């Protein structure tokens, strides 16, 4: 069964948004609004994400991402992309994805058992 009037978009928040609980506050705000999707720290020092939900709640979240964030964050700009209307939700809830640089060995490339080789 299709769900009607579901909108979605990707976002990327620039500024001081890592190490200031931005993702945790975004999670709370998205859940409060009934939005679904995810957010994560990027290797570029930004917070990226995807949100889906009803248009009115999406607008509130977009404004929050542009102007509010977490108490210690400093937002320079937000870019929204891939905005579209969907037939149904793609996610069951909103969650925080792990950082792309987590779970890497601390001394990557050291030792004889490493399969990583630099090509420089």
UniProtKB/Swiss-Prot annotation:
It catalyses: an acyl phosphate + H2O = a carboxylate + phosphate + H(+). Its EC number is 3.6.1.7. Keywords: Acetylation, Cytoplasm, Hydrolase. SUPFAM superfamilies: Acylphosphatase/BLUF domain-like. Belongs to the acylphosphatase family. Residues 96-107 have a biased composition (Basic and acidic residues). GO terms for cellular component: cytoplasm. It is found in: Cytoplasm. Optimum pH is 5.3-6.3. The modification N-acetylalanine is found at residue 2. Pfam families: Acylphosphatase. GO terms for molecular function: acylphosphatase activity. The active site is at residues 23, 41. Its main location: cytoplasm. Residues 8-98 form the Acylphosphatase-like domain. This is Acylphosphatase-1. Residues 91-120 are annotated as: Disordered.
């Amino acid at each position: 069964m299709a769900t009607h009037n579901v909108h979605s978009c990707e976002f990327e928040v620039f500024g001081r948004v890592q190490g200031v609980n931005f993702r945790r506050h975004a999670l709370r705000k998205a859940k409060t609004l009934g939005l679904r999707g995810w957010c994560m720290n990027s290797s570029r020092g930004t917070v990226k994400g995807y949100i889906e939900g009803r248009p009115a709640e999406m607008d509130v979240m977009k404004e929050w991402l542009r102007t509010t964030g977490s108490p210690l964050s400093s937002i320079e700009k937000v870019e929204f992309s891939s905005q579209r209307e969907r037939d149904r939700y793609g996610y069951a809830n909103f969650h925080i994805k792990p950082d792309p640089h987590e779970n890497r060995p601390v001394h990557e490339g050291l030792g004889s058992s490493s399969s990583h080789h630099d090509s420089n």
